[in-house]
Amino acid sequence: MNKADILQKLHELNWPAEDYWVVAGGAMVLYGLRSETHDLDLGCTTARADILEAAGVPFHPMEDGSGRCFTLGEDVEVFENWLVDRVEPVEGVPVISLQGLREMKRALGREKDRRDIALIDAFLQRGGV
């Protein structure tokens, strides 16, 4: 999923910007740190999560028990209140801040997350956002 694909998915969702934010690989793509991601992960407010549950969208508890994780189709997951730091607009799209994204990746601790942290750090050292 490239930047255009992500923007199209978000357009199709048609959610108010205050209800959600892009995290994980999608945020990496929107910041220009990667050209594509396998899927789109979003954070959302409890109010949006309640709307999704009422609409019958499949969900399960998040691993840490802090909220719900919804599955929209084959390539979009929505995590209730999954946010570190703050949300900032990137080309008009609500996206987790780079510092928040870095911390989120550090907490996940997978090899691909360590590679992403290196990309974020290099970008910040070059004076990015």
Whereabouts are the PLM-identified features?
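Compositionally biased terminal segments of proteins
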Residues: 1-129
